[in-house]
């Protein structure tokens, strides 16, 4: 089977991956309230972009389609970390959001304490999934190293800290870029780089640049989508800092740079990652 389009890839892989992830938590988490709270946010309608990017890179690096299920543990770990971050991000002490993806935020559904524990459970269960993976020790160690680096205090957590402690300060463009890189882009970069390592593909600067570019582009797209609803009026966003038109130009430049970077990648099927860029045209 040869798949050239990212959307087609997700259509074929996502149902099986979702079933795998649900079954893992259903069977491994015995405390019912904790399990319900974890699954509530995990199954809240996310697109699974990060694990799908991980699997797409593995597939593009030569992993056969029928063997992709061997990589579900690592893909699942990436999604668990992402979901934990959303639960904690919505807490009253953070962004204080009552809704996520059209549903009550976890803390509004279960309470603040259970929501914190649900996030804690997802984060720690992620590394259990990696440890139990059937992949070789060196690949599992690479996944732990990259994911903990990019999602922890040297990456995503640092970005979140900057976000909540600098709310009353207008950040410079460089500071805002660093914030978005850490808070949003680093986990996307992790998904792509772990995908390459897991498939035995030698990581290049071109693939890293692609990952960094689309990671920042993700945040710009979200900022633009939210620019008209008024909710981000007092937040550090690129539309607020440089204007909507210049943000759109910056987004277009990032997508162009990402395309040029992945086209330089050698010994790698570029089709899925090139077609993924259509996401930013929606």
Language-model features: where?
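All-alpha prenyltransferase/terpene-synthase fold signal
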Residues: 1-282
């Amino acid at each position: 089977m040869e798949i050239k389009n990212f959307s087609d890839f997700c259509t074929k892989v996502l149902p099986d991956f979702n079933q795998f992830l649900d079954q893992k938590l259903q069977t491994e988490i015995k405390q019912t309230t904790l399990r319900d709270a974890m699954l509530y946010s995990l199954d809240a309608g996310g697109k699974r972009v990060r694990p799908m990017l991980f699997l797409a890179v593995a597939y593009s690096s030569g992993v056969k389609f029928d063997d992709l299920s061997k990589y579900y543990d690592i893909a699942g770990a990436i999604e668990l970390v992402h979901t934990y971050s959303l639960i904690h991000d919505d807490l009253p002490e953070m962004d204080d959001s009552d809704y996520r993806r059209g549903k009550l935020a976890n803390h509004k559904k279960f309470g603040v304490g259970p929501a914190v524990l649900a996030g804690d459970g997802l984060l720690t269960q992620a590394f259990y999934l990696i440890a139990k993976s059937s992949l070789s020790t060196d690949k599992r160690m690479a996944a732990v190293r990259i994911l903990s680096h990019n999602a922890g205090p040297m990456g995503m957590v640092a970005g979140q800290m900057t976000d909540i402690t600098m709310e009353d300060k207008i950040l410079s463009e460089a500071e805002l870029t660093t914030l978005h890189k850490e808070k949003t882009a680093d986990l996307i970069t992790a998904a792509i780089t772990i995908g390459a390592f897991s498939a035995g593909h030698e990581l290049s600067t071109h693939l890293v640049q692609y990952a960094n570019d689309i990671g920042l582009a993700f945040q710009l797209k979200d900022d633009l989508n939210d620019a008209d609803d008024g909710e981000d009026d007092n937040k550090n966003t690129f539309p607020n800092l440089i204007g909507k038109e210049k943000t759109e130009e910056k987004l277009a430049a990032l997508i162009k740079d990402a395309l040029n970077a992945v086209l330089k990648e050698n010994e790698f099927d570029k089709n899925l990652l090139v077609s993924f860029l259509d996401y930013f045209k929606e």
